[in-house]
Structures are given as structure tokens and as C-alpha cells.
Amino acid sequence: MKKEQDSNVTEFVLLGLSSSWELQLFLFLLFLFFYIAIVLGNLLIVVTVQAHAHLLQSPMYYFLGHLSFIDLCLSCVTVPKMLGDFLQQGKSISFSGCLAQIYFLHFLGASEMFLLTVMAYDRYVAICNPLRYLTVMNPQLCLWLVLACWCGGFIHSIMQVILVIQLPFCGPNELDNFYCDVPQVIKLACMDTYVVEVLVIANSGLLSLVCFLVLLFSYAIILITLRTHFCQGQNKVFSTCASHLTVVSLIFVPCVFIYLRPFCSFSVDKIFSLFYTVITPMLNPLIYTLRNTDMKTAMKKLRIKPCGIPLPC
């Protein structure tokens, strides 16, 4: 990497969430619990969907399996490093490690945004056009939609890395965060970053905003349809939509706030970052399965054979 070799900065210092040792120890235990919950919850959903053919053939559960896999991987990008930093004084990350965090965070984050938008469209078709649901959301279309989500995330993340890797770093190297993210890294560059900031805002900020608006529009149409055509279980659907919108808002609102504005340093940014890196990956398994009878029944049918492979009873 020529830019990395030309730069005087070979590592970044992460200021983290707190400088108090007592608070860091408490945060370590708290986020360790969160991380275990994220891994177990999302892994259980992935295994359950894969172990039951009827769930895997359903568009909703097919997308849910991919969402849980993304959340599982997304938490692994930042949380293990954060947990390790809580237990040591020096919190640093190499330049290449920083680029890796940026790449995987934006790859998985953008893929999740696209997938949540696809899932909203899936629910729109299921509720507003139920007679043609299985025809419209056929397996081939579902596969192509998921591939499009992953490809979109890949393209988005590559663009972020290209913008950052070309910047020269020759001075301060402190990031007021618990991981490397584009806004804080760009502000450390020893050059005018106005054009780069505009490109990142256009790439990340507008992406978050457009996906969020599409989601809101889809759920608005769903709610209007439910009010116009009363059907059995309407209250349950309303409640489920409200839960989904809550989780979606916890992902998109912080992203819009962080990326769709000039890159001024706010200490609250790292608090907002916790929502889409820790909180929502932990809440998604609860929100998407707590009210889902089919998923809960399928989980109860899982049994563990002596070899350790989960299979349906």
C-alpha cells in the first residue's frame, strides 16, 4: 500500500468509551453479556432456518436467516476488539487493521440496510398482494435479491476504503471512538478533505437516508392497507410492524445522523455507533422471533445429536 508507506502514521489510538478503569471493567462485563447474547441468538436463528426445509423455502425466513448471519458477523468486527481494549491501557489499531474494520463494517452494514429494505418489500407483497405472494417472491427472485444485497454492500465498502486509503496521515492519530470509522479517520488527514467528505456523505449518508425512506414508505402502505381492509390478526400485525420499525430506526437514524452532515467530531457519535454495532444485532433475534410462532416451534424441535450437529426432530 503506497499511501500507507508514505504516511507517518502507522497506527491509530482509540480513545474508547471511557478512561475510567472501574467504568471500563463494568462496560467489559456488560458488553461481554451483549456479545454472548448476539452470538447465541443469531446463531440459533441461522441454525434453525437451515435445519428446517419449510423455513428455508419461505421468503421471510430465508431473508431472516441472512439477516441473522450479517448481524453475527457485524458484531465480530468491532465488539471483540472493544472487549480487549477494556482490559488494557493502550488502545491502538494498525493502519491496515483500521482499513479492515472500515471495509467489513461498511460491507456488512450496507448489506444489512439493503436486506432490511428487501424484507420490507417482502412484507408489503405478503400483506398487500397475498394471492400472488408466492408467485412474486419465488425462490429465484429471493436468491437474486440476496445476491444484490451482498454485491451492493461490497461495492459500497470498496468505495469507502478507496477514499480513505488515498489520504495522507502525518499528524494526530487519536480517534474518539471504540473502532475505526470513516468520519473520524478522514478528519485526521493532513490535507483539505472537503471533496472526500462530500463523496462519503453522498455514498453513506444518502444510502442510509434513501433506504430508510423506502422502508418507511413500505410500512406506511402496509399500515394503510390493514386499516382499509380489516382482517383477522390485524392488531398483531400492527404490533409486529411497530417492533420492526423500532429496530430499523435504531439502525438508520444513527447512520443518517453520523454520515449525512459535515464531519465535525461529536462525542455522542460513538454512543450512536453502539446502536447499529451492538444493540440492534442483539435485539433483532428477539424482535423477529418473539412473536413468531413458526420460528419458536421450529426452535423447540431442534435436537443435538452426539456428534454436535443440530437436526430437526
Swiss-Prot record:
Recorded hits in InterPro entries, A to Z, give: GPCR_Rhodpsn, GPCR_Rhodpsn_7TM, Olfact_rcpt, Olfactory_Receptors
Q: Where are the transmembrane segments?
A: 26-49, 59-80, 102-121, 141-159, 197-220, 237-259, 271-290
The record's annotation in PROSITE patterns points to:
G_PROTEIN_RECEP_F1_1, G_PROTEIN_RECEP_F1_2
Function as written in the Swiss-Prot or TrEMBL entry = Odorant receptor.
Matching SUPFAM superfamilies: Family A G protein-coupled receptor-like (SSF81321)
The molecular function terms of the Gene Ontology recorded here are: G protein-coupled receptor activity; olfactory receptor activity
This protein's UniProt keywords:
Cell membrane, Disulfide bond, G-protein coupled receptor, Glycoprotein, Membrane, Olfaction, Receptor, Sensory transduction, Transducer, Transmembrane, Transmembrane helix
Glycosylation site list: 8
- CDD domains linked: 7tmA_OR4Q3-like (cd15935)
Membrane association type: Multi-pass membrane protein
Can you name this protein?
A: Olfactory receptor 4Q3
Record gene name = OR4Q3
Q: Which GO terms describe its cellular component?
A: plasma membrane
Work out whether the entry's keyword set contains Glycoprotein: yes
Q: What ranges are annotated Extracellular (topological domains)?
A: 1-25, 81-101, 160-196, 260-270
What organism is the protein native to? Homo sapiens (Human)
